Structures are given as C-alpha cells and as structure tokens.
Amino acid sequence: MVFGAMSALITPFINHKVDFETYETLIKRQITYGMDACVPVGTTGESATLSHKEHMECIEVAVAVCRGSKVKVLAGAGSNSTSEAKELALFAQKCGADALLCVTPYYNKPTQEGLFEHYKAVANAVEIPVMLYNVPSRTGVSIEIETAKRLRDACKNIYAIKEAAGLMERVVAFGAEVPNLALLSGEDVINYPILANNGKGVISVTGNLFPQEIADLTHYALQGNMEKSYEINTRLYEMNRILFCESNPVPIKAAMFLAGLLKNLEYRLPLVPPSKENMAKIQQILEKYEVKE
C-alpha cells in the first residue's frame, strides 16, 4: 500500500514535447527531500492532454527513477473510458508501479452504479492496490460514501481514496462509515485538517516546490505530533492559496519556473500561462519562501 507524503508531479514540456531530462531531475528532488511517493500523470501532470504514449512513458520514467529508493510510484490511470482505464492500469502494473490512482470518469457523468462498475472493472483487472480519486469540481461527479463502502467490500485491492471535494463533513463521515478505506488529502489547503481526522497521507501540489516541508508536515502528523504539523501547515498557507489562483497546474508550473526549477514555462492548450496580475502575485508570495534546489 502507498501512504504518507506524495507529490502530484507536474509534467514539464519543451518545444511541445515532454522534457524527460527535467522530469527525472524533479523526481530525484522528491527522493532527496524525503517524500514517500510520487504521483505521475494525474491532474497536475496534465494527463488530459498527454498522448497515450507520453502517459505511459511518464510512468515508465517515474518507476525507473524511483527504483532502488524508498519512494514509491502511485501511477495515474484514470479515464472516462473504462476500457482505457484498464489499459493504463495494466501497463502501470507491468512496468512496476506500486499502486494506481484512478479518478472518477469525467464528462460522461455516470450514476453511482456506473461508478461502482467502472472501479470494480479496473480493480479486478490488476493485482496492485487501487486508490479512488474524488474531485467533483473537475469531473462533474462525486463518489458517494455508500459507493466507496461497496467498492471497498467488493474489491480487496481498493484500499484508499484521495478526497478533493473540500468538504470536511465528508472527511468525518468517511472515518465513521468506511473506517477500512484509508483517506488521503487531495487539496493542500486542507492537508492538516484531514491528517488530524485520521488521514493517512497527502497528495500535494505544493510538494512540487516544497517537498521537504510537505514530507515533514505529513510525517509529524502521522507520528502524532500535531503541533509541529500545524506549524508547517500555517507557514505554507499563503503558498497553498496562491497555487490555486487559477486552474491547477497553471500556478504551480509558473512558480516552479520563477524558482528556477523549470527551464521554460510551457503548457498544453487549452491551458495557458497565468495572467500578468496573477503572475505578479505568485512572484510576490514566492519571495517570502526559500525554495531549495
């Protein structure tokens, strides 16, 4: 199983292609600063605009770089086509990913029964652990707690959910109603509250910039030192907020470019760089922090 501190990796581009040299460097930085896992080709990795070949190559590279370290790979394998999700899941398993992150199918807005059948099909196609991913603001559909409970009972390898609905009532309800399904934060602004409610980790956007701080915040909480965790969470508050001033991953890539972690600032359309106003705000907030190489 994959728990603890994880970063939802960005995908760097150069001249409209994936910059794998920089990608490897960024993953090695995650290893250096004590993260427990990296998460390639999720929302932050612009998976929606990667080709199948690029998607698979990103997983392969992440697995290769992390091999031999303590850092695991939670590979993005989500799709709004169940057959495509199964294909990505099987590929990730074959190349050595430790677990899968599967977002709810987007755009086609399945019913709860459709979600159940989708996830069951993906989970039954593989042997490695599967983490559900609930982000209704992106997908237009939310996994109901009863559906998550049914999936946990029906599929032994569905072990956790990344919760990014932003509703603390759901977080508390998950702990009470589905205690055998691990809960992880999918939103940096509520990392601490979720960890304080028996969360088992975080999947962080901010961790791309501040892996050591996110690792420390998470590890302190998991060790029961909530005061230390809270202190770090408070220090990161302004950064967590500004990194969502526009659609993720637009601000995080801009911040990484300004911090010298990216060679250039490039997105795949329809994503574009931040507005001049937001770029200035990101720069202003970034100057308050020290970004380690």
UniProtKB/Swiss-Prot annotation:
Keyword Ribonucleoprotein: no
Gene Ontology BP terms: diaminopimelate biosynthetic process; lysine biosynthetic process via diaminopimelate
Site positions per UniProt: Part of a proton relay during catalysis: T43, Y107
Enzyme class: lyase
Positions annotated as active site in the UniProt record: Y133 (proton donor/acceptor), K162 (schiff-base intermediate with substrate)
Protein localization: Cytoplasm
Matches recorded under Pfam families: DHDPS
Family of this protein: Belongs to the DapA family.
PANTHER family found in the cross-reference section: 4-HYDROXY-2-OXOGLUTARATE ALDOLASE, MITOCHONDRIAL, DIHYDRODIPICOLINATE SYNTHASE
Subunit structure: Homotetramer; dimer of dimers.
UniProt name for this protein: 4-hydroxy-tetrahydrodipicolinate synthase
Gene: dapA
